[in-house]
Curated annotation (Swiss-Prot):
Family the entry assigns: Belongs to the CobB/CobQ family. CobQ subfamily.
Cited Pfam families: CbiA (PF01656), GATase_3 (PF07685)
Job description of the protein: Catalyzes amidations at positions B, D, E, and G on adenosylcobyrinic A,C-diamide. NH(2) groups are provided by glutamine, and one molecule of ATP is hydrogenolyzed for each amidation.
Gene: cobQ
InterPro entries from the UniProt entry: Class_I_gatase-like, CobQ/CobB/MinD/ParA_Nub-bd_dom, CobQ_GATase1, CobQ_N, CobQ_synth, GATase_3, P-loop_NTPase
Entry's Gene Ontology molecular function annotations: ABC-type vitamin B12 transporter activity; catalytic activity
Source domain of life: Bacteria
UniProt protein name: Cobyric acid synthase
Amino acid sequence: MTTLMVQGTTSDAGKSTLVTALCRWLLRQGVAVVPFKPQNMALNSAVTADGGEIGRAQAVQAQACRLQPHTDMNPVLLKPNSDTGAQVIIHGRAVTSMNAVAYHDYKTTAMQAVLASHHRLSAAYPVVMVEGAGSPAEINLRAGDIANMGFAEAVDCPVILVADINRGGVFAHLVGTLELLSTTEQARVKGFVINRFRGDIALLQPGLDWLEQRTGKPVLGVLPYVTDLHLEAEDGIDVRQGVKHERVLKVIVPVLPRISNHTDFDPLRLHPQVDLQFIGPGQPIPAADLIILPGSKSVRGDLAQLRERGWDKAIERHLRYGGKLIGICGGLQMLGREVHDPLGLEGAAGSSQGLGLLDYATVLEAEKQLRNVAGTLSLEAATVTGYEIHAGVTTGPALAQPAVQLADGRHDGAVSADGQILATYLHGLFEGSQSCAALLRWAGLEDVQVIDYEALREHDIERLADLVEKHLDTVQLRQLCGVA
C-alpha cells in the first residue's frame, strides 16, 4: 500500500485537479487507486453511496477512479454557516456547529476520524491519492494540523508540492513554503509541479534549474494553462462560459452570502443556448427569462440579505412580467410562507417570513436528509436524477402539485398553479440531459440543444490524464506511487 499526498502553496493552486488527473492516470495503468482528503472546507458537497456527504471535489475524483463516492474519501467536511463558524461533518454526518476556537480544540477527535478512514482505504486499495487543503505553511494553523503536513507526518507519506505560475511569484511560493516547514516535513516533499504555465517552456527552464539547485528537489513537470475544463470548482463560483448562440435564454442566479452547491449551475454555464449571470451585492436583477434561487447554508440569514438588496421586489416584478422562477433546496424554503429554526441549526434560533410565493412552511430539524434520487419531472415527464442534502421538513398545500415524482414513491417540491414557479429539494437538476432540456423549454427556450454534461466531465478527466502523460515525469511518479 502507498499513500501519496498533493499539497499546494496556496488555495486554488491546482491540488484538486492534479489529484483527479493522477487518479485517472493511475487507473489507466491498471492500478486500483482511491482519492482521499482528510479535511475539506466547502459549501459544495455530494451525497455518497453510504448515505453521507463529502466535498464535491472528492466525488469527481472518485469518478476519475471509477468508484462510487464514499464518506471515507473525505472524513471531515466543514460547511461555513457564519463568518466565524461552521457545521462539522464527520464521516458524512453532521455532528454540530462550532466556532474556530472550539474546532481547534476538537481537532484531536477529528484526526481520529481521519486516520480511521485512511486505514480502511489503505487496506482496500494499493494507492491512496491524497489532497491537502489550502497551504501547509499557514503558521497560525500548523498546531494540531490534520489537513496537510500533520496528516502526512501521521501516516508517513511523501508529498508533491504544486504551485500556480499564473498567479506570479511561483518560485517565491515554492521556496517560501518549503522554508516554513520543519526539517522532517521538508524531507517529505519529493518534488514540485508547476501548474497553469503559458508560453515557451525554454524561457522557464533557467528558473526550473535554479529551483532544483536551490532546494535539492526535482521539478516533476510543468502543466499548461487549460481554459476549457468543465470540472466543478472546489470553492469560488466559476463564471466562465462557453461559446453562445445568438438566441439564448437569460438566466439569473442571485448570489447570497451562504450560497451552497453552486455547481448546480455548471451545466447552464456551459450550455451554448444559456446566458447565465451571477448577480452579487449592489447589483440589480436585470430582465431575464429565468431566475434561480440557489441552495443556502443559512436560509434565514440569506433571506434577510435578499430583502436588504431589494431582490425580493425584483423577483415579484419578474413574475408579474411572466418570467419563470426556480428555487433549489434553500431556495425552495425561501419561496414559502415561513422558515422556522427552533434549534438554532443555522444561526440564532427563531423564525423568518419567507417570500410567500408558494403555500408551505419549513421547519429545520437536526437530522439531515441525505440521499441520491431518481424520478420524473412533472414537466414533460422527463427523467431526472439528483441528490438531497437538507435539514428542512416542508409541509403545506402547495406540495399537492409536486415538481418531481420520485422513483421511491415520494413526491418532491412544488409547481405553482400558474406554472411560473418550480421548487425542488433536488441538487443536480440540470446535469441530466432530459431534465435540463425540459426545464429550459419550460423557461421559454425553443429548439433546445441537448447537452450530455456527464460525457463532458468524463472527457475532461481523460484530458487531465493525457496532460500527466505528456508533461509530468511519469517514471518518478510511478516510483512515488510504489508502482513498478
